[in-house]
A protein has these predicted regions:
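The feature marks the mature, well-folded catalytic cores of soluble enzymes
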Residues: 1-221
Length: 221
């Protein structure tokens, strides 16, 4: 509070959409301009109801699965990414699809496939049911990747079951929470293969740092 008892609102910077989301929205907008409505999008292009409603008014139809779309239609995959199975289904239904997956999510996909090709079992730190996690896990056979959500999941791992292992993460996680899980996992597997650069994207990291920087002078967030 200041002397006049007025509330002060601090806005973190940076804030708002990341480059990957803006790219995905732009792909949808350009598709509308080029082909006209309807344009189908598998899952919400971004978790923002205002953006979704605005695009719906322009003729975008958001669906949960490809089975909700007539064969042969145009469809866009959201920034969160999709499994290899979804792309195969789109091809079998003769759909003209555009992949708007964030390039930083694709980086994690490539890591998963490379580790699998090299014979490593993969541990993915992320949230069960999140579209990005579903897409990443769907890049390789199910028995080659294990999802870890918390410390209990890591404590339950039988390290003697695995020879060579690798670590990847969801791109949109708490930096601090993920660091704790990684350290715990490295105690079990000192030689675990880590990403050359962390998988949590720079936009996620920057925005968390921005909130931390103003939190010290705020009474409430």
């Amino acid at each position: 509070m200041n002397k006049k008892n007025e509330k002060i609102l601090y806005l973190p910077n940076p804030r708002g959409f990341c480059a990957g989301v803006e790219r995905a929205i732009n792909i949808v907008e350009l598709s509308l301009e080029k082909y006209g409505p309807p344009i189908y999008v598998r899952h919400e292009i971004v978790h923002n109801p205002w953006v979704v409603k605005d695009l719906e008014k322009k003729g975008v139809i958001f669906v949960d699965e490809l089975s909700d779309i007539p064969d042969g239609e145009r469809v866009i995959f959201s920034a969160h990414g999709v499994s290899s199975e979804v792309k195969s289904e789109a091809n079998s239904k003769k759909m003209d699809f555009t992949d708007a997956t964030c390039p930083l999510v694709l980086k994690v996909h490539f890591e998963a496939k490379r580790h699998f090709d090299n014979g490593l079992h993969i541990f993915l730190i992320g949230h069960k049911g999140h579209p990005e996690v579903d897409g990443t896990m769907g890049q390789i056979p199910k028995n080659s990747i294990t999802l870890l959500e918390n410390e209990d999941d890591i404590n339950k791992i039988n390290e003697r079951k695995y020879d060579k292992v690798a670590l990847i993460t969801q791109t949109t996680l708490s930096v601090d929470d993920t660091a704790r899980l990684i350290n715990l996992l490295k105690k079990k597997f000192p030689n675990i293969t880590e990403p050359p650069r962390e998988d949590i994207c720079y936009a996620t990291t920057n925005r968390q740092m921005a909130v931390k920087s103003i939190a010290k002078k705020c009474d409430a967030i």
